[in-house]
């Protein structure tokens, strides 16, 4: 039908090697880098805060080096349509707040009083109390860029060429599982907290 609404073209595409490096860094970031950092920093007597900081700092540096051209291309697109991008950011933020309220209600129904104890959030809060500076740099600057390039650009961008629905589902589940899998190893019930990350991974 001529009046059927058409989605805007998807232009945020990495090159073949940019995709390989972004997705390929996932197992490095999740498993190999933490193990290497723990061995090195424990030998040096460093704290858990600096262990986490070093893992994200290495990933952040790797992503900037390997994805710089992709970031530069997309920054040009943002500048060309700044007003439209700003409207999308604000509307998405408002939608995320609404979705978060709904998710919080679902968690209360499922877990009752235990719904406030997301172990990942507790861990970040505790690290912030112990060492605010490194944790703030990690959470505000390094983690968003690193995670967006792996999950949004890498996984979503790759699958988007074949199926928009599959791209959303896989990238959302991967992003959500990424935040709770370590805690679920100790208690599988912690997998329920994946739903807290679905709104932000969708938007």
Task: Name each model-derived stretch.
Residues 89, 93, 125-134:
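Alpha-helical membrane-spanning segments of integral membrane proteins, especially the hydrophobic core
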Residues 110-130:
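Membrane-interface interhelical connector segments
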Residues 82, 86, 106, 120-124, ...:
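Hydrophobic alpha-helical segments of integral membrane proteins
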Residues 101, 130-203:
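Transmembrane helix-loop-helix hairpins at the membrane interface
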Residues 1-117, 185-189, 195-198:
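N-terminal, membrane-interfacial amphipathic/helix-forming hydrophobic leader that caps
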Residues 25-27, 117-123, 170-177:
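Short acidic/polar alpha-helix capping motifs at helix-coil junctions
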Residues 71, 106, 123-127, 137:
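Generic structural signal of hydrophobic/aromatic residues within well-ordered alpha-helices
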């Amino acid at each position: 039908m001529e009046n059927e609404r058409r989605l805007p073209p998807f232009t945020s595409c990495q090159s073949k090697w940019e995709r390989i490096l972004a997705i390929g860094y996932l197992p490095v970031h999740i498993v190999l880098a933490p193990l290497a950092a723990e061995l090195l920093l424990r030998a040096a007597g460093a704290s858990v805060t600096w262990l986490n900081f070093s893992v994200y700092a290495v990933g952040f540096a790797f992503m900037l080096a390997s994805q710089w051209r992709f970031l530069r291309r997309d920054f040009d697109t943002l500048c060309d349509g700044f007003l439209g991008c700003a409207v999308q950011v604000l509307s998405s933020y408002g939608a995320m707040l609404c979705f978060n309220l709904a998710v919080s209600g679902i968690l209360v129904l499922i877990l009752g009083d235990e719904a406030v104890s997301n172990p990942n959030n507790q861990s970040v809060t505790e690290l912030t109390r112990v060492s605010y500076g490194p944790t703030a740099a990690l959470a505000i600057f390094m983690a968003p860029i690193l995670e967006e390039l792996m999950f949004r650009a890498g996984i979503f961008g790759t699958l988007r060429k074949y199926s928009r629905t599959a791209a959303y589902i896989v990238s959302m589940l991967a992003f959500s599982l990424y935040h709770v899998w370590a805690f679920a190893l100790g208690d599988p019930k912690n997998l329920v907290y994946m739903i807290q990350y679905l709104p932000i991974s969708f938007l």
